[in-house]
Structure formats: structure tokens, C-alpha cells
Amino acid sequence: HDMMSGSFLFPPHNPENDIAILFIETSGCLPMCGHGTIGTITIAIEEELIQPKVPGKIRMEAPAGVVEIEYHETNGKVEWVKLRNVKSFLAAENLTIDCPELGEITFDVAYGGNYYAIVDPQSNFTGIQDFTASTIIQYSQVLRERINLKYPNAFIHPENDTIRDVTHLLWTGDPLDPTSSG
């Protein structure tokens, strides 16, 4: 269940905000979770677990910071949710790590509420289209651990030292459909 997550709702610390959310997964607590935010806000609005100060807008506290959310509701159902996440930044470029099955992999690390290692297509990784989801998950677990061992204390948020280490891997590839976008 490495890819599953959950959330706990709390009253906000700052009364200007609507809610505080703590995200959890098998590795522990996450500073932020985009898909978790969308799902949690959807159910919290539909089940009337929160009463936003401004209809259609929510200010949410997460360990990573305040996230601004907009949503649209019709007949008690949330139709869409969009969020403005915490500030993101590039933390490192062109790092390398040995992947037992693939050999040396080059990757970048970016922050967007969590630290993500980003693996683009390269000579020994042609893209996600050539791998099963379970294989990518397996590689991700191994590489996450290896990255944090090889680069100890390299990924610590400059404003919150409790946010540290690569917690996610993002594998990319070419679009499967040339008309795809996004």
C-alpha cells in the first residue's frame, strides 16, 4: 500500500484560515498532498464537515504552509477543485543514483510541498510507457531510499527543517497520444 494516503481534519491554528489538514501515508506524515487535498476538500464540503468563510474558497493549513483552494459546488456536489499550492522551487539538477535494474539514473529534485526526484527519459530509462505501474513503484521505493542515503541532509526546506528528504519520485515519458496535453 505504498501509494495510499489519508488525511485528518483539524481546526485551523490561524482563525483567518478555514481548516487544517494532516496528510498520512505508509512512510509517515506528508507536508502536503495535492490529490489528497482535492479528495479531502470534496468530501468535507459535500458532507458539510467545514463551513468556508467565503463560499467557493478555502484557506487550508498544511505542514508545508497555507494552500488556497477554489471549488465549485452544484446541488450539494463538488464539481471541481483547484488549488494554489505552496511555493515550489528546483532544489538540485543532474544528480545521479544507481538503480540495480537500470544502471545509473540522472534526476533532478524539485520541491512543491514535498521533495520529488524527477526522472526524465534517458539512455537506460526510455520512459514510463515501457514499464508496468508495479515496476515503477518498486523502483521508486528503492531509489527513494538510495537517494536519501547518498545525499543526506541535501533536501531540507529552507524555512521548515521538519520538511526533508525525497519522499516521491516522478517518472516521465513521451505522450502516448500525440494529441495529449497537460
Write out the residue ranges for each language-model feature.
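Active-site proximal loop and beta-alpha junction motif in alpha/beta enzyme cores
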Residues: 1-32, 39-182
